[in-house]
Swiss-Prot record:
<feature type="glycosylation site" description="N-linked (GlcNAc...) asparagine">
    <location>
        <position position="320"/>
    </location>
</feature>
<dbReference type="InterPro" id="IPR042235">
    <property type="entry name" value="ZP-C_dom"/>
</dbReference>
<keyword id="KW-0472">Membrane</keyword>
<keyword id="KW-0245">EGF-like domain</keyword>
<feature type="glycosylation site" description="N-linked (GlcNAc...) asparagine">
    <location>
        <position position="127"/>
    </location>
</feature>
<feature type="glycosylation site" description="N-linked (GlcNAc...) asparagine">
    <location>
        <position position="197"/>
    </location>
</feature>
<keyword id="KW-0964">Secreted</keyword>
<feature type="disulfide bond">
    <location>
        <begin position="106"/>
        <end position="173"/>
    </location>
</feature>
<dbReference type="GO" id="GO:0016324">
    <property type="term" value="C:apical plasma membrane"/>
</dbReference>
<feature type="disulfide bond">
    <location>
        <begin position="394"/>
        <end position="454"/>
    </location>
</feature>
<dbReference type="Pfam" id="PF23283">
    <property type="entry name" value="D8C_UMOD"/>
</dbReference>
<keyword id="KW-0325">Glycoprotein</keyword>
<dbReference type="InterPro" id="IPR001507">
    <property type="entry name" value="ZP_dom"/>
</dbReference>
<dbReference type="GO" id="GO:0002412">
    <property type="term" value="P:antigen transcytosis by M cells in mucosal-associated lymphoid tissue"/>
</dbReference>
<feature type="domain" description="EGF-like">
    <location>
        <begin position="179"/>
        <end position="223"/>
    </location>
</feature>
<feature type="disulfide bond">
    <location>
        <begin position="78"/>
        <end position="168"/>
    </location>
</feature>
<dbReference type="GO" id="GO:0009986">
    <property type="term" value="C:cell surface"/>
</dbReference>
Length: 530
């Protein structure tokens, strides 16, 4: 027994027993060698022979991620200077690898690994061989090391007594799978953080068992053209679903499989179109709400296991949705064929206010006196990202004949009639929608009705200037040549008599526009005024 220094071992009652190693481990198949040494003491016969210490408390920390076996950067780094007790920490790993490491890893030429298993708590200091891989020999060089398992505040760790390296460039490696768990995002309760494919990531727990389908709450991405429904892949696995999940919407013809998404989610999509795939569209006055049900099955043949997930997306009410949800909107539609670009559908409707979300309904529009009429048109089929809707000419006639010689132009040659201060063109030639408003009127003479007609043009924004530039000279241009095959017609619009306030056919649902009608009209003058 070696004498113990009183300053070091008073509390331990000098119960130290040293068993010096007598076995040299060759190759990389050595068995566990437990020496039951807890403290490291100076070499016998040296001046420090009586000085002993616990390497768990006295060591040098090495925090160097480049030691990771996943580091393939070649370098001449060498550990010939490392002598003493060391602890590996950091993202590169906290333990030496226990299997052969490929050459040119760990930021060196010949990487060193631990031949044998690591000790566990209570084993004390054990002897191992560190091997360096080179020249197709996993233990071309070797060096004796000592290892001890320690217990700290953060858990178990290991310390290593290194004796430099037999040659350069050799370096001690670390196993990145032993690095502290460091997933970039917090794992959900149904996940666990593991080292996989050379990085830390959240994966589904293998022991997950889910019985409550209510926990399967979808994440929704309410896009402009489609609704993406995302479900937790881990929870689906806990319910018994495998990789291939068959999906159905309300319309059983809309079926497919879930697609993988990042972070253990799977998804499917539904179009944002009324009635498509069984979509149910509701209008609550301020929002358009699309509802559907996603059904999940494990196979195309269903016997006893089907999960239904209800979902809905709410959108701000717009012109298109308001027309889809109106019972009997007053609209006019036209199919326009653009060579090489397909067929487009243009729709025009009359609206009650500047929100363009409350269309007039019925067979005709019966207006209060001096009401402002709001006219909206939109492309609802075709490539709206490329083509913009442009109203080239909009005019009123006292008859339903779009070629009536009596015309009052509201928009002429793409520009508003600036002699009529009530005309306001809010949008034209800049998107898939066009909007304008005008204070309504009646033609003088024996005319009780007003009809609106608009010539439309689909402007290719990639080759044309679509937004009108309205100069004074252009406003005074000659009579436009109108392509009657591209004209939308809407009407009739008639004056609502003050003496007949109960008339409801075609009136807006929200009344309260009681102004004064113009009292002087001259049809011929109006026809040539602009």
């Amino acid at each position: 027994m070696v004498a113990c220094d009183l300053l070091w071992l008073a509390a331990a009652s000098c119960l130290l027993t040293l068993v010096f190693p007598s076995t040299t481990h060759q190759g990389y198949g050595n068995p566990r060698n437990t020496s039951n040494v807890d403290l490291d003491c100076g070499a016998p016969g040296s001046s420090s022979a009586g000085i002993c210490f616990d390497p768990c408390q006295n060591h040098t920390v090495l925090n160097d991620p480049s030691r990771s076996t996943e580091n393939t950067v070649s370098s001449e780094e060498c550990d010939s200077h490392l002598r003493g007790w060391y602890r590996f920490v950091g993202d590169g790993g906290v333990k030496m690898p226990e299997t052969c490491v490929n050459v040119y890893r760990c930021h060196t030429y010949a990487p060193m690994w631990l031949s044998g298993s690591h000790p566990i708590l209570g084993d004390g200091i054990v002897n191992r061989t560190a091997c360096a891989n080179w020249n197709e020999n996993c233990c071309f060089w070797s060096s004796e090391v000592q290892v001890k398992a320690c217990l700290g505040e953060s858990g178990e760790y290991h310390v290593y007594k290194l004796q430099g390296t037999p040659e350069c460039s050799l370096r001690y490696c670390t196993d990145p799978s032993t690095a502290p768990k460091k997933c970039e995002i917090a794992c959900r309760p149904e996940e666990e953080c593991v080292f996989q494919n050379n990085s830390w990531t959240c994966v589904c727990r293998q022991d997950l068992n889910v019985s409550d389908t209510l926990s399967l709450q979808p994440l929704l991405d309410c896009g402009a053209n489609e609704i993406k429904v995302k479900l937790d892949k881990c929870l689906l696995g806990g319910l018994g679903f495998k990789e291939d999940i068959i999906t159905y919407l309300n319309d059983r013809n809309c079926r497919g499989t879930m697609k993988d998404e990042p972070n253990n989610w799977v998804s499917t999509t539904s179009p944002v179109v009324a009635n498509d795939c069984g979509n149910i569209l509701e209008n609550n006055g301020t929002q358009a709400i699309y509802r559907n049900t996603l059904s999940l099955a494990t196979d195309f043949i269903i016997r006893d296991f089907l999960v239904n997930v209800n979902f809905q997306c709410a959108y701000p009410l717009d012109m298109n949705v308001s027309l889809q949800t109106a019972l009997q909107p007053i609209v006019s539609s036209l199919n326009v064929d653009v060579g090489g670009a397909g067929e487009f559908t243009v729709t025009m409707a009359l609206f009650q206010d500047q929100s363009y979300t409350h269309p007039y309904e019925g067979s005709k529009v019966l207006l209060p006196v001096e009401n402002i009429l709001y006219v909206g048109a939109l492309l609802n089929r075709g490539d709206t990202s490329r083509f913009k809707l442009l109203l080239t000419n909009c005019y009123a006639t006292p008859s339903g004949d779009r070629n009536d010689i009596v015309k009052y132009f509201i928009i002429r040659n793409r520009c508003p009639n600036q002699r009529d201060s009530t005309i306001n063109v809010e949008e034209n030639g800049v998107s898939s929608e066009s909007r304008f408003s005008v204070q309504m009127f009646m033609f003088a003479g024996n005319y009780d009705l007003v009809f609106l007609h608009c010539e439309v043009y689909l402007c290719d924004s990639t080759t044309e200037q679509c937004q009108p530039s309205c100069s004074t000279s252009r406003l005074r241009s000659s009579e436009p040549a109108i392509d009657l095959t591209r004209v939308l017609d809407i009407g009739p619009i008639t004056k609502k008599s003050v003496q007949n306030p109960d008339t409801s056919n075609g009136t807006p649902r929200n009344t309260g526009f009681l102004l004064a009608w113009p009292t002087f009209f001259l049809p011929v003058f109006l026809a040539w005024l602009f």
